[in-house]
Amino acid sequence: MAKEIVGGFKFDQRHGKERVQVARVWKTKQGWYFIVEWRVGNSLLSDCVNSYVRDDNSDIVATDTMKNTVYAKAKECSEILSVEDFAILLAKHFISFYKQVTAAIVNIVEKPWERVSVDGQPHEHGFKLGSERHTAEAIVQKSGALQLTSGIEGLSLLKTTKSGFEGFIRDKYTALPETHERMLATEVTALWRYSYESLYSIPQKPLYFTDKYLEVKKVLADNFFGPPNVGVYSPSVQNTLYLMAKAALNRFPEIASIQLKMPNIHFLPVNISNKDGPIVKFEADVYLPTDEPHGSIQASLRRLWSKL
């Protein structure tokens, strides 16, 4: 927030445009189409305090102008680029184009359009909607200082065995039985902050951040599931979350910190009886899926040298 002392009070302000929907299509010389669909939010920290305390809008960048800028900059992108690179591009524009703007915050959620295959062949121009969403946030200061965060929303993971929960606190309110055999399901939200601290330090390789996103997603999923034939036992969501986050930091030195949110989405054993006896006897086979209420587990790991 842009901070001022106004009328004897501390005053913080910023303004922007949220939920700007934009899609961009590219066609290669070989005839292949590519598409991205983004939901963009812009927020500017600027010297426009007079618009709040006086009848003076002369320092305001109109939010409608911010919306139009999203489309104009998308039009200028002649080459396919990552969601992170587009966020940085927008933020750089705002801090350089407007002398009043001291910092820009751009956050984007990418809709997961995936190329389809027909008869075993990738389709040149056909796409289907996937599930998890790629997110990015770029905070760029007038000085060129950068904070870049990537993330995943809605990564649904489930394993039907190799999970348990034992040894927890028991008291007069506890009804949950201990178990060493249960289903484990979650919907991962992940945020990781890169260690790049300026616009001049980010990699210039095309689609670098898209590739990194796919690699981080794979590491998180692989450590949730374990090896394909034997899996890995999870004594709690907490332990699994920690091991997933630790694996990401160990694998990617360019990541300074990572935060994971992993709700424990319950699949309840089904036992149904009447006066004549069992109708359904649970034998690790029939469950009642329920997403409310659910356990809420989250944690973050950061490197000791990280200033974040």
Curated annotation (Swiss-Prot):
Q: Which UniProt keywords apply?
A: Nodulation, Oxidoreductase, Peroxisome, Purine metabolism
Q: Does the keyword Oxidoreductase apply?
A: yes
Per the record, the pathway is:
Purine metabolism; urate degradation; (S)-allantoin from urate: step 1/3
Q: Name one GO biological process term.
A: nodulation
Residue ranges annotated as motif Microbody targeting signal: 306-308
What are the protein's GO molecular function terms? urate oxidase activity
Q: Which PROSITE patterns match?
A: URICASE
Q: Which InterPro entries match?
A: Uricase, Uricase_CS
Give the EC number(s) under which this enzyme is classified.
1.7.3.3
In terms of Gene3D superfamilies, this protein maps to: Urate Oxidase (3.10.270.10)
Record: active site: 17 (charge relay system), 63 (charge relay system), 266 (charge relay system)
Q: Which reaction does it catalyse?
A: urate + O2 + H2O = 5-hydroxyisourate + H2O2
| Binding residue positions for urate | 63-64, 165, 182, 237-238, 264
From the Swiss-Prot or TrEMBL record, state where the protein is found: Peroxisome
Concerning SUPFAM superfamilies, the annotation shows: Tetrahydrobiopterin biosynthesis enzymes-like (SSF55620)
Q: Per its UniProt entry, which superkingdom is the organism in? A: Eukaryota
Q: What GO terms fall under cellular component here? A: peroxisome
Question: Is Oxidoreductase among this UniProt entry's keywords?
Answer: yes
Function field: Catalyzes the oxidation of uric acid to 5-hydroxyisourate, which is further processed to form (S)-allantoin.
Report the family membership: Belongs to the uricase family.
Q: What is the protein's name according to its record?
A: Uricase-2 isozyme 1
Could you tell me which species this protein originates from? Answer: Canavalia lineata
